[in-house]
A protein has these predicted regions:
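Acidic, PIN/NYN-like endoribonuclease modules and their adjacent C-terminal/linker elements
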Residues: 1-2, 71, 100-129
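Short, well-structured N-terminal submotif of metal-dependent ribonuclease cores
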Residues: 1-37, 50-63, 116, 127-129
């Protein structure tokens, strides 16, 4: 089962934000679960540590994406086109629309996020943490 990871679940994991980190780790450790973020999630995770000059946290994120994640989904034209449709129909923010489109195009089964507003989207199962 492929789990698309929005940036928030990754941030919770790396920063050990409880009780979220334990719940996320438990879900992702289940047999057959493949976590799949996109390049957008990688970007979003890296901004705050970079802005704050927190090299240790930035390295933790870089290590996670390099060593724990087997695949980072690229944002190509098909993702952007679907994101445009999602944004037009649901009026979500552009990053949220890109995340949802990436999850659908990459054939993920579940979209993991902390954003309850995204539950309105019907193109994939949304799991809110």
């Amino acid at each position: 089962m492929r789990y698309y990871l929005d940036a928030a679940p990754i941030i919770y994991l790396i920063e050990q934000s409880q009780p979220f980190a334990t719940a996320i780790r438990s879900k992702l450790a289940a047999p057959g679960i493949v976590p799949l973020p996109s390049e957008l999630a990688r970007l979003e995770c890296r901004v705050k540590p970079m802005r704050d000059g927190n090299q240790a946290l930035l390295q933790d994120f870089d290590d996670y994406f390099a060593n724990t994640i087997a695949e980072i989904f690229p944002l190509k034209r098909d993702v952007v086109d679907l994101a445009t449709e999602i944004r037009a129909q649901y009026n979500f923010k552009t990053p949220d629309s890109l995340h949802l489109a990436a999850a659908v195009i990459s054939n993920c089964d579940i979209f993991m996020t902390n954003d309850q507003r995204l539950n309105r989207y019907t193109g994939i199962i949304i799991e809110t943490i």
